[in-house]
């Protein structure tokens, strides 16, 4: 099998073992137009990330790598679609103002999930633990929604993120959610 087919099979295996990613991960790496050499080089680069026994540390490293790629993609994709990526510094200030120690965090236009990542970091930095908050969000751009789902999975954040192409202000997928 080609490297693309192996990656597609790996994506399907990940979806099978992580139901929150079902139908989210791309499985089109075997297509002819994709440069197999570059794909192999990217896999080699990612494989150098230290995934050792310290799972929290390895999740953070993988999360930062994901965030780096996400920043580049979201910036380019958002400008094409009239959407904008909220800078991490703004998200950090919002999180500090909200002080999400426990309970629910809801973002009606969650994009790639930056508010959720920062909220979990806030909880941990203030003596709490991941899981002290539950995160909920909505996103109308299907590609960005998929990125958010992957972002949460990479970081081990349990999240309920809904997608609808009308947007949360026109069609609220979480209307029954209470504060």
Name the predicted role of every residue range.
Residues 1-101, 160-173:
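Non-catalytic, mostly N-terminal accessory regions of nucleic-acid modification and defense proteins
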Residues 80-178:
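Conserved S-adenosyl-L-methionine
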């Amino acid at each position: 099998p080609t490297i693309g087919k192996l990656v597609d099979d790996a994506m399907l295996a990940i979806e099978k073992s992580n139901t929150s990613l079902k139908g989210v991960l791309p499985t089109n790496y075997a297509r002819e137009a994709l440069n197999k050499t570059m794909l192999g080089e990217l896999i080699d680069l990612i494989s150098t990330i230290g995934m050792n026994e310290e799972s929290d540390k390895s999740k953070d490293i993988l999360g930062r790598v994901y965030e780096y790629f996400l920043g580049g993609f979201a910036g380019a994709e958002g400008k094409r679609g009239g959407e904008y990526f909220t800078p991490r510094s703004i998200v950090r200030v919002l999180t500090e103002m909200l002080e999400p120690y426990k309970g629910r965090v809801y973002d009606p236009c969650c994009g790639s999930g930056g508010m959720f990542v920062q909220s979990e970091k806030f909880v941990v930095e203030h003596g709490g633990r991941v899981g002290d908050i539950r995160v909920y969000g909505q996103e109308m751009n299907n590609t960005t929604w998929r990125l958010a789902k992957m972002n949460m999975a990479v970081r081990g954040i349990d999240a309920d993120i809904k997608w609808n192409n009308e947007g949360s202000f026109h069609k609220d997928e979480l209307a029954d959610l209470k504060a």
